[in-house]
């Protein structure tokens, strides 16, 4: 999962992009990068770390230009080495930088095509570098001479759609020409546009979530629709065209469950409102399965589950209390690489308020249960604080299958619900009872907010992969690549190599 942003303005954009990345930091805490364009020259800085740590004053001063792109990354394909931080750059044709949110599912095939047919070398394991090279090749094929017009760019994206499979929301710069953005034909990963009126004309921001637009003082214009390409030239003129033959809207359901900020609007649906609906439908199920008096108090697991827990408590007429305090300086545990790190971080991240638990039958509400590491630790914390009985509720259905579209759910065996019944999962997390959201209720939670959304990418819950190209062999290969057993010092070795090369005079 990543957060991306692109800006075309009439004044320097370095601070705008930095601020946007801070607003998207929840989408990735592994690396950050910014590339700006002034005339025909790119300036770029990227590194591993949080936005506030990657960019210092000297870095910001070097990022000159009135257009630029940025990204915050959590790695889902390739490694987490600094050399794979984005944006990526290629010098021909014209000079292009690119930032990508998603995951390509036919990347190995594309690498072979790149080498044998397109004569292009891929230097990292990142699928984003592959995507950039496909874009560059198709742009070379679509243009003649030194000119570049919107028609050629839309032809480029149309050709890319025919070659590339998977999920991709993209912002790219073409040196001296402008900003290109596009979304895959299934609309899996979010992308939206905002604008601002100035004395010199309109300026635009394109970002993963609407919260980035609003936080910059831009007005939300609309979402980029599946398969669409948008080009904004350096004068701030916007062009758009549908570039896919059969686009369909299949937004990722997990964006609404966990990934997106609650104050964002994705594809016309308020994330906050969908989470309230999840709580409402979960309350209906709990009412059917538990009798009056079995639950004394409802508590959320901060922060994503809070809207669902509040609505659930309201509908069941139960007391709602905050039982855990979150340390906001600890990253999101689901997005932390390495199971051992996740387990250790839970108690550093959350601290129980003992008086809220003592002698009570507690219903704990979380947004989802993925690996079960966090859930198990939280149940134990509740017991240690004196809870009489601990019931655990998930606002999402059981996560039983890997996600191949840009979320780090690497192996089936790591998913606690894979191959287990609800009763077995309950025993694994040591709860007294467990309640999962039904998948149809989850989908209704989103459709109730925006009835235009009828189909979803919900493969981690139902095992249905909307792109239609995912086989068991593919999942086996993916698990091998993303396995947590990867040597811990691998990235350190690669980074050291890069550092040595960087100091060669």
Protein language model regions, located:
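Flexible loop/turn segments at secondary-structure boundaries
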Residues: 12-14, 76-77, 106, 179, ...
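PRPP-dependent phosphoribosyltransferase catalytic core
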Residues: 161, 176-178, 183, 217-223, ...
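Conserved short alpha-helical segments that host acidic/polar catalytic motifs at enzyme active sites
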Residues: 1-226, 231-296, 301, 389
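A conserved beta-strand->alpha-helix junction
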Residues: 55, 129-134, 320-331, 428-446
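Extended, hydrophobic alpha-helical segments in both membrane/secreted and soluble proteins
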Residues: 298-301, 305-312, 316, 320, ...
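Short, surface-exposed amphipathic charged segments that create phosphate/polyanion-binding patches used
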Residues: 84, 135-140, 335-340, 406-407, ...
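Flexible glycine/proline-rich, aromatic-decorated loop/lid segments
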Residues: 202-209, 248-249, 333-347, 387, ...
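Short, glycine/charge-rich flexible loops or terminal/linker lids adjacent to PRPP-binding catalytic cores
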Residues: 314-362, 373, 400-410
């Amino acid at each position: 999962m990543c957060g991306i942003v692109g800006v075309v303005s009439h004044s320097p954009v370095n601070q705008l992009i930095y601020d946007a990345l801070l607003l998207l930091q929840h989408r990735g805490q592994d690396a950050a990068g910014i590339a700006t364009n002034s005339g025909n020259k790119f300036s770029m800085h990227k590194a591993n770390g949080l936005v506030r740590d990657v960019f210092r004053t000297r870095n910001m001063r070097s990022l000159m230009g009135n257009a630029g792109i940025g990204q915050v990354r959590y790695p889902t394909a390739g490694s987490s080495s600094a050399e794979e931080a984005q944006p990526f750059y290629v010098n021909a044709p014209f000079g292009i930088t690119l930032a990508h949110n998603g995951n390509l599912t036919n990347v190995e095939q594309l690498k072979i095509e790149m080498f044998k047919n397109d004569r292009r070398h891929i230097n990292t394991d990142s699928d984003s570098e592959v995507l950039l090279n496909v874009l560059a090749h198709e742009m070379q094929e679509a243009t003649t001479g030194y000119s570049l017009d919107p028609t050629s760019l839309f032809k480029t994206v149309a050709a890319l759609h025919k070659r590339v499979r998977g999920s991709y929301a993209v912002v790219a710069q073409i040196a001296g020409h402008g900003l290109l953005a596009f979304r895959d034909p299934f609309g899996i990963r979010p992308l939206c546009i905002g604008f601002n009126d100035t004395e010199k004309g309109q300026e635009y921001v394109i970002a993963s979530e609407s919260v980035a637009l609003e936080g910059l003082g831009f007005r939300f214009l609309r979402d980029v629709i599946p398969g669409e390409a948008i080009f904004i030239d350096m004068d701030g003129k916007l062009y758009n065209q549908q570039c896919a033959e059969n686009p369909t809207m299949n937004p990722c359901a997990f964006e609404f469950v966990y990934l997106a900020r609650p104050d964002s609007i994705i594809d016309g649906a308020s994330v906050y409102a969908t989470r309230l609906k999840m709580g409402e439908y979960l309350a209906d199920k709990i009412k059917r399965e538990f009798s009056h008096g079995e639950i004394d108090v409802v508590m959320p697991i901060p922060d994503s589950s809070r809207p669902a827990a509040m609505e659930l408590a309201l509908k069941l007429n139960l007391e709602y209390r905050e039982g855990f305090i979150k340390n906001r300086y600890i990253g999101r545990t689901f997005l932390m690489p390495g199971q051992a790190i996740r387990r250790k971080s839970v108690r550093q991240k959350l601290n129980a308020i003992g008086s809220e638990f003592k002698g009570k039958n507690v219903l704990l509400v979380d947004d989802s249960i993925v690996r079960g590491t966090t859930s198990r630790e939280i149940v134990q914390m509740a017991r240690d604080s004196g809870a009489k009985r601990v019931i655990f509720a998930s606002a999402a259905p059981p996560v039983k299958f890997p996600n191949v579209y840009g979320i780090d759910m690497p192996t089936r065996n790591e998913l606690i619900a894979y191959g287990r019944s609800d009763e077995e999962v309950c025993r694994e997390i040591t709860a007294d009872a467990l309640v999962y959201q039904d998948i149809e209720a989850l989908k209704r939670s989103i459709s109730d907010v925006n009835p235009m959304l009828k189909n979803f990418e919900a493969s981690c819950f139902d095992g249905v992969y909307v792109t239609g190209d995912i086989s068991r062999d593919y999942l086996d290969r993916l698990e091998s690549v993303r396995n947590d057993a990867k040597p811990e010092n691998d990235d350190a070795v690669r980074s050291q190599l890069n550092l040595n090369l960087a100091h060669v005079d």
